[in-house]
Amino acid sequence: MCRRNVILVFCASFALFFTFIIFGRYPGGRFAVLYENATGPSETRPLKAFISSSYFYPTSKSLGDNALALVMSVNLVQTPSFLTPYFQEIVISAENATSSAVVSTPFFRIIPHEQCQIMTIFATAQLLPNVKRIQMVSHDGLTDIPFSPPSAIKRDVVMCIAPLFVSEQWQNFLFAVHIYKKYGGFMNLYLISTINTFFAVMKEYEKEGYMKVQPWPKVNFPGVPMDIADTHGQIEFRSQTAAQTDCLLQYKESAQYLAFLDLDDVLIPRIAPTYIEEFQRIIKGKKPLAYFLYHKENYEAFVTPNSSQFSLKNMFGSLKCRNFRETGKSVIDPQNANYTWLHYPPVLVNGLEKYEVEENVITHLKTINWVEDEVKTGNGTIIEPMYYDNSSATIISSKDIKDIEDDLQRMRNKPEIKKLFAELPKIRYYSDLVLKCYNEKFYDYFYSGRYEKITCPGPQYCDFKQHPDITCMRVNATHIERETLSPVTYYYAKDPYFTDKMGCYAH
């Protein structure tokens, strides 16, 4: 059995640590200007806003008809050198074939702390029907912005996977994507960079309908000095909050539920045969919920680096509970929230409540060991991994393991995928660099109580020393330098694409 420690660690998640230990005093919600101190800095910093998402909804149950939803990264937090301008509303201009309108709307801060200078915000406004042109209005100019419709393909459940960078854990990917397919989930994976052969496998799974690979370009203000807007060192976790909110907005009208996970957070239904049935059972008889939270239990896995020998059956059989609970992740009804932070929406609105799930947990693949002598089972033997508690319960049935393994074999026998599998990485290099960096820059400080040493969290402090034999696909896009407008200059990325000419890095 997999026994729990009597004393649970309250918070193993670095991200949640920021909320409760250091920044609990910042509640989130509508941004109010906090800095109008005449004794402080005298120079006002120009605001720069990067638009990550702009969706237009002809109809929406929660946003209203002809609604625009925006997700932006803005340098809102005051620095020692600059004042923050007085800025409370966004002004939007819209045109259709016959008329035009100008609308002012408040915005809402999503990130509930001020450790990073660049904040993620959300705004929405109802515009005109059949809109043809949308512009952001500044005092001294207009900025045309692109916009797109949300997804119209009906889905029960979408798994929103946080942005990956220098990713090489292909075994983890196969484990997750086949599990999600089995239980009725569609994976939307945000991607910054990954090993080129791993990327090619992802794209084949995208063609087969398992998932969507969504490029996640960096926040960029071309020509803007770093003391005005530091897009390298002052954005929390590779703009993960913006990515997760993008996923919520993208599937707002088409999915019944959205689960927000990292790739190594794998949710396996336990109280019902599918995700949608489990979620419906959880909410049954409860007051309306903004979200429900699954806690994470850490597991260790042992996998082969040789793709020709890799088996999901063997990977399941190798799982060992490590008696450590980490901060969970949320499942959201997209009609009940417009934005979300790393783990959950930062505020509850309209009398909605939250619920912590007790009937199931996320299987967190905290450690994935690449070993030549992995745990192997005979052709007819299936080992069911143990559930975390003191019972004899298991995470998954042998029948479901067999179904998932059969699905893997079906995919790998496709000629193109079979060829790509043979080229998957056999060494782990960047994963170890990132783990070492995060321990040195964040976790070691946290566990030793040296909280003052912790800065804006993210991979920007890691040294990605390039490996001569490893090539990565990395996202790029067109970014345009713009004339400064007051109080805000608006930017966005155009035409994102992946290239193998930019090295293996995060943003």
UniProtKB/Swiss-Prot annotation:
Enzyme class, spelled out: transferase
Principal subcellular localisation of the protein: membrane
Residue ranges annotated for the GT92 domain, each copy included: 155-444
Transmembrane segments annotated in the record for this chain: 6-26
One GO MF term: glycosyltransferase activity
Lineage: superkingdom: Eukaryota
This protein's UniProt keywords: Glycosyltransferase, Membrane, Transferase, Transmembrane, Transmembrane helix
EC number(s) given by UniProt: 2.4.1.-
Transferase recorded as keyword: yes
Keyword ATP-binding: no
One Pfam family here: Glyco_transf_92
GO cellular component: membrane
Subcellular location(s) of the protein: Membrane
Topology within the bilayer: Single-pass membrane protein
PANTHER family: GLYCOSYLTRANSFERASE FAMILY 92 PROTEIN (PTHR21645), GLYCOSYLTRANSFERASE FAMILY 92 PROTEIN-RELATED (PTHR21645:SF17)
Family: Belongs to the glycosyltransferase 92 family.
Name of this protein: Glycosyltransferase family 92 protein C33H5.2
Originating organism: Caenorhabditis elegans
